[in-house]
Structures are given as structure tokens and as C-alpha cells.
Design a protein with these regions (language model features):
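Gram-negative bacterial Sec-dependent N-terminal signal peptides
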Residues: 1-19
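Transmembrane beta-strand segments of Gram-negative outer membrane beta-barrel proteins
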Residues: 24-38, 56-73
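Outer-membrane beta-barrel porins/channels
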Residues: 20-32, 78-82, 91-460
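Outer-membrane beta-barrel pore proteins
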Residues: 39-61, 98-103, 150
């Protein structure tokens, strides 16, 4: 029997917040409540995340800290049959920022926040465990920025994005030969980039009028080189293919000697030879599965190109109390044509993604109910990058719509904000191939994520 290969279908595909691709846009409670439509003005040090050029608006040292919690779920269907629910539990996405004015019109800023994230979890016995049982990705950016006010109306900034990127996945891989699965190998693939990869960003803000301002932010590609380890162990053997193959082999051998069904010796000879060859074939197959699992154990590596993006936005003060904003983000997810995993033995795998570029559009409004209390709300439409015939169960298919409300309260030098949002995922479907080459239809429905956030700022 030939060597059996583990079909490792590891790939990177969904986010904790059900955002398109695996990008995260939750930089602060106020930013969440306004749908990211804060490109033209800064309120706190989270400007490091949304548009660092607006750091020039801040006077004095400002420290901003907080977190967003996410809980995504979805009902999944495989080949038209109800399957296990996707429910990874609750994730916490912390953020921390500082802004410090400097002489000669400069402002220094530093942001620490997750830019990328993934979290999916299925029951270990769900029908696509060969694709994934659970996957977690963390992409945390350490982002120093320097803003400069060229004039009272125009400011610019430049920054470095030092990225820590980690990947962790459990799956039940197929041990495959000639299109047949002979067993299941429990696989645990993990790794990170050691925080050695970086990119950059540029932004600008211009006050068109006293009430209208515009902002733009560009983020570069980041090429991440992930190194880690692949752990394997045999979960179970599948002898169904062996039984079928031995049966056909014995029948062919008997027919070659003129013994076919109906011959008086057929049943006796069939049982004799079947018993003889079946045991040997099973022992050999089990040995090959064990060898395949052992060969896949060891150091692993992968390369991932994080996409470039461009965000543009406007902010308009309708009155002294009513403020409107919009933000549009283009992300070049098409740069992720495929992901190449370098695994021990002969188990290297190229996972085709062929994603589409996406647009994310947000509209936000804020109303100053009192001098200290502001009410906020927003709506976001977020495109799904997946193509119908390329994908994995880690990314339930479908565009996202997000509705968020929130408030901000000024108390002395403190600025406290909180938000709550619902992420609605449109039901859709895609096709995934298993290790034998068979195609399966994955459908999602009732996709929903709860997103709650709180952020506190202090002005020194």
C-alpha cells in the first residue's frame, strides 16, 4: 500500500466580530457606537486607531483604555442537513492608547489594539471536523504615530504597525490514499511570527469648513512569517474502504479463474480468501495511518500577507448638538490568493482562497443631550470576501450588517463611553472539498454576534 498522506486543510478565514475576512474594526466604544465614522475629528486617544492625523486636536496628555467583547453564533448546514451550531463563546478585545502633544505642532501617539482576529468553535463530532473544529487567530498591532499640524486646518501623520500574529487550530484530518480515507488524525497546528513583522500607515485630516472635515487613512501590507509546531495523534481508523477493496479484489481473482457467483465453490472460496486478505489489509492500513500521523508531527511554518486598506470619511456638525459622520473602507483581500503551509513529511498544503476585495460603509450620528452626556448610534454594511467555490467552515458565508448604539459621559477629566451592537450575517452558502476530493455544501443562517464595549479616557 502506498504512503497515506494527511490532508491538512488549515486556513485563515473568519473574525471574532463576524467582520469581513478576519479584520477587526472595534477600536473603542465611541468608535464602535459611531460606526468608525470619526475620520474628521478626535475625541480621545483612540484617534491612533481611526485617524492618527486627528491627534492634533487633543490638548494635553490623554490616556484611553477599554475593551470590546464579542460573542458570535450561527446555525450551520452541511449538504442540506442541519449540523452543529458554530458557537466559540465570548472573546475580549482590549485596547489602550496614549496621546502626548509635543513642541512645534507635533503630537506623539501610541496605540495597542487588535487589528485582526478569528474565533470559531464547533462540536468535535460535527460533520466537517476534517476542515476545522476550532480556530483562533490574534493579530495585535503596536502602533506608534507622529502627527503634525501643518496649518490650523490641515494635519498629517505617519506611523509604524508592529504586528504580533498567532495562529492556533484543532481539526480531525483525513488519512487519504487514492481518494479513500483510512482513518482520522487529530491535528493541532499552532504558531506565531514572534512580533518581527511590520507595516506602516499614513493619514491626513483637512477641515473644509468650520463644520465639515474630511479624513483619510492608508494601511500598508504586512507580510507575516509564522513558525510553530504541528501535533498529531491517531483518533480512529476507518476500515470501510478496505472492506470494499478486498471484496472487489477477491471477486476479480475468482472471476479470473472462472469462478463467479453461482459457482458451487464461490461462497466457500470467497469467504476463505476474504478473511485471509482482509486482516492483512487492515493491519497494513492501520500501520500506514500511524506512519502518516507520525510523519506530520514536527515544526511547521506558513506565510500570510495581511491586506492593504484605505479608509475615507467625513464629519459634519449639523448644529452645536447634532453631529453626523460617515466612513468607507476598501480592503484588498484579493492579495490572499492562497496560503502555503510547510508541514513535516510530505504534508505541505496550499489552501486556495481567491478572496474578493471588499467595501465597508458606516454611518454614525451623535447628539449632545446635555453638556456632559452624548447619545450615539450607527449602521454599517460589511461585504463578505469569500468566493462561492473557495472557502472553509471557519468563515460562515454572507455579508454583514451592524447596528450599534452607545453613549459618552464627561465627568471631570474622565470621559466614559459604552456601546452595544448587533452584527447580523446574511444567510449564504459555499462549497468545500474534503481530503478525498468530494465536494460539500456549507450553508449558514441566523448568524448573529453581540458586541459590547466600554472605554475610559483621562485628560491630564
Amino acid at each position: 500500500m502506498k504512503k497515506l498522506n494527511l490532508v491538512v486543510l488549515a486556513s485563515i478565514s473568519t473574525s471574532m466580530a463576524f467582520a469581513a475576512g478576519f479584520g477587526l474594526y472595534e477600536g473603542s466604544a465611541r468608535g464602535n457606537a459611531l460606526g468608525g465614522a470619526v475620520m474628521g475629528k478626535a475625541v480621545d486617544a483612540s484617534a491612533n486607531f481611526y485617524n492618527p492625523a486627528t491627534l492634533s486636536d487633543l490638548t494635553g496628555t490623554v490616556v484611553t483604555v477599554g475593551m470590546t467583547t464579542e460573542h458570535p453564533t450561527a446555525d450551520m448546514y452541511v449538504d442540506g442537513h442541519s449540523s452543529r451550531k458554530m458557537d466559540p463563546g465570548c472573546f475580549v478585545l482590549p485596547h489602550a492608547y496614549i496621546a502626548q502633544p509635543l513642541p512645534w505642532g507635533f503630537t506623539f501617539g501610541l496605540g495597542i489594539a487588535p487589528e485582526y482576529g478569528l474565533g470559531t468553535h464547533y462540536h468535535k463530532y460535527w460533520s466537517m471536523a476534517w476542515d476545522t473544529r476550532d480556530t483562533t487567530i490574534e493579530g495585535i498591532s503596536f502602533n506608534p504615530n507622529l502627527a503634525y499640524a501643518i496649518t490650523e486646518d490641515w494635519s498629517v501623520s505617519a506611523g509604524i504597525r508592529l504586528m504580533y500574529f498567532s495562529f492556533n487550530q484543532h481539526s480531525d484530518q483525513m488519512a487519504v490514499q487514492d481518494g479513500h480515507s483510512y482513518g482520522t488524525v487529530r491535528d493541532h497546528l499552532r504558531g506565531d511570527n514572534g512580533m518581527t513583522d511590520w507595516g506602516w500607515q499614513l493619514s491626513s485630516r483637512y477641515k473644509i469648513t468650520e463644520k465639515l472635515s474630511a479624513g483619510v487613512l492608508y494601511k500598508s501590507f504586512i507580510d507575516c512569517k509564522i513558525k510553530g509546531y504541528n501535533h498529531t495523534r491517531v483518533e480512529k481508523y476507518d476500515d470501510s474502504a478496505i472492506a470494499e477493496q478486498v471484496q472487489k479484489g477477491v471477486q476479480a481473482a475468482l472471476a479470473g479463474n472462472g469462478i463467479t457467483p453461482g459457482h458451487p465453490m464461490y461462497n466457500t472460496l470467497f469467504q476463505q480468501y476474504y478473511s485471509q486478505y482482509y486482516g492483512a489489509a487492515v493491519a497494513e492500513a492501520h500501520s500506514k495511518v500511524d506512519q502518516g500521523a507520525a510523519s506530520a508531527e514536527g515544526p511547521a511554518a506558513a506565510k500570510v500577507r495581511l491586506p492593504q486598506s484605505l479608509t475615507m470619511g467625513l464629519n459634519y456638525d449639523v448644529t452645536d448638538d447634532l453631529h453626523l459622520g460617515t466612513a468607507v473602507t476598501w480592503t484588498q483581500w484579493s492579495c490572499m490568493e492562497e496560503i502555503n503551509f510547510h508541514l513535516p513529511g510530505d504534508n505541505d498544503k496550499t489552501v486556495p482562497l481567491r478572496w474578493n476585495d471588499t467595501w465597508r460603509v458606516g454611518f454614525g450620528a451623535a447628539y449632545d443631550l446635555t453638556e456632559n452626556l452624548t447619545l450615539m448610534g450607527s449602521y454599517i454594511f460589511d461585504q463578505d470576501p469569500c468566493r462561492r467555490y473557495y472557502g472553509t467552515s471557519m468563515l460562515p458565508p454572507g455579508d454583514r450588517q451592524i447596528a450599534t448604539i452607545g453613549f459618552g459621559y464627561m465627568w471631570g477629566n474622565f470621559d466614559i463611553s459604552a456601546s452595544y451592537g448587533l452584527v447580523f450575517m446574511a444567510g449564504d452558502s459555499l462549497f468545500i472539498h474534503d481530503g478525498t476530493g468530494a465536494r460539500h455544501k456549507l450553508e449558514s443562517s441566523n448568524g448573529l454576534s453581540h458586541a459590547a464595549a466600554v472605554t475610559v479616557s483621562y485628560r491630564f
